[in-house]
Amino acid sequence: MAASSANKSRPLANFHPTVWGYHFLSYTHEITNQEKVEVDEYKETIRKMLVEAPEGSEQKLVLIDAMQRLGVAYHFHNEIETSIQNIFDAPKQNNNLHIVSLHFRLVRQQGHYMSSDVFKQFTNQDGKFKERLTNDVQGLLSLYEASYLRVRDEEILEEALAFTTTHLKSIVSNMSNNNNSLKVEVSEALTQPIRMTLPRMEARRYISIYENNDAHNHLLLKFAKLDFNMLQKLHQRELSDLTRWWKDLDFANKYPYARDRLVECYFWILGVYFEPKYSRARKMMTKVLKMTSIIDDTFDAYATFDELEPFNDAIQRWDANAIDSIQPYMRPAYQAFLDIYSEMEQVLSKEGKLDRVYYAKNEMKKLVRAYFKETQWLNDCDHIPKYEEHMENSLVSGGYMMIPTTCLVGMEEFISIETFEWLMNDPLIVRASSLIARAMNDIVGHEVEQERGHVASLIECYMKDYGASKQEAYAKFKKDVTNAWKDINKEFFRPTEVPMFVLERVLNLTRAADTLYKEKDAYTNAKGKLKNMINSILIESVKI
């Protein structure tokens, strides 16, 4: 018989207070016309430089790579697309490991399939990479980065990753500070390869690396710095507006049991899309994510089962009249939740895009049902579900099936009904992204959650069903994460079922999970590395 929730104390988590408070209220600087003019002038100079570089040349490959890593490629989308298409259509023979690896990575990043057989020229008859390559640090680094674009069953790229990782670790430990720029770049890559790095984080770190590279392009560097600072002003202004909204709700006081993480939510969504044209979408999505976080904590860290049953029903009804059926303390959050989606409807109905909100609501209902399912398991005498059952529910309850749909709502591009239907059917790339987020979250957080009476994690379920040790479960989950990344890479190969910009949102969302859950749950424990990342992206400007 189910345990009576009335006899259970609330499962309080005692999350630490907000790191930022209302700090960003004061960031109201507007981008000046002078700044816009200066950036536009540099942009046209860089565009000319890109167009005039010989097609397929080393010069053009290196320039495109620098643009992408410095965070300014969004200005030259069409030109880069054309250049990569030309490189793909007419590849040139080359025996330079750095150039072949760079060529391979750029082509695959753009969604074109290029065979990994291009690396066979660098291997012996036994399939092992030639030892002489260990003297080519730049080549090793490029091959290392290229290996993260691998898909399943690409043994040569598995070998490449193992080979380069081993030798780069050895090289960096013995490298003198005379090669400081390259040493920093190698160290950063070993910690966070390009494929898994959030675009703004990559831009911030690469500006410093690029500046210390003697071969850097002065105009491109200046442009990247100006653009970073100009975008930072826009992002600060957005966060100021969101902080005003959050302060007016007064939810930090009304829901003291929940994680007060508005700035962290914004950083998360900034990872999904940073470009100016997505300003509206970012603000909409940040509000949704912040309210989702409160709902998640209400389920996990405060409410009793008897309170959650009518709350779940109210979400499924999506009706202001349902507010009387839920606990008084839940009502402000429920009303604010409805208001966010009503605001979306008001804005999008004028553009004939009301159907987008319908799909977003459906995904949110599905997410809350998944939260409630976990509550039912916990209430049912601490029932431990089967691993497969828990996995299917966890892929939803992690939120990574809700966000890809909802983040499209405020975007300006044309997005077809078929794309939203495709997302609703849990495509492979979304399942892979969800698995990465859930597995990484469980690895770093499951022991803490069990201490406060949380539903059994996927790790506990796997250990119970398969008689595995904790370390065996960790190894299994890490392997699953690696394979999920390979699936994401494969889903980018053209022709794709949906526009590339939709897939890019899922990729960036996955990068956010990798960033936030790599060593610990940085969203919950936001005082450490996440605070430093936010500081570098949203507070500290780049010195010109």
Swiss-Prot record:
It comes from the Eukaryota. Gene3D superfamilies: Farnesyl Diphosphate Synthase, Terpene synthase, N-terminal domain. Signal peptide: none annotated. Its EC number is 4.2.3.71, 4.2.3.-, 4.2.3.15, 4.2.3.113. A motif (DDXXD motif) lies at residues 296-300. Belongs to the terpene synthase family. Tpsa subfamily. The Asp-Asp-Xaa-Xaa-Asp/Glu (DDXXD/E) motif is important for the catalytic activity, presumably through binding to Mg(2+). This is Terpene synthase 9. It comes from Solanum habrochaites. The lineage of its organism: Eukaryota, Viridiplantae, Streptophyta, Embryophyta, Tracheophyta.
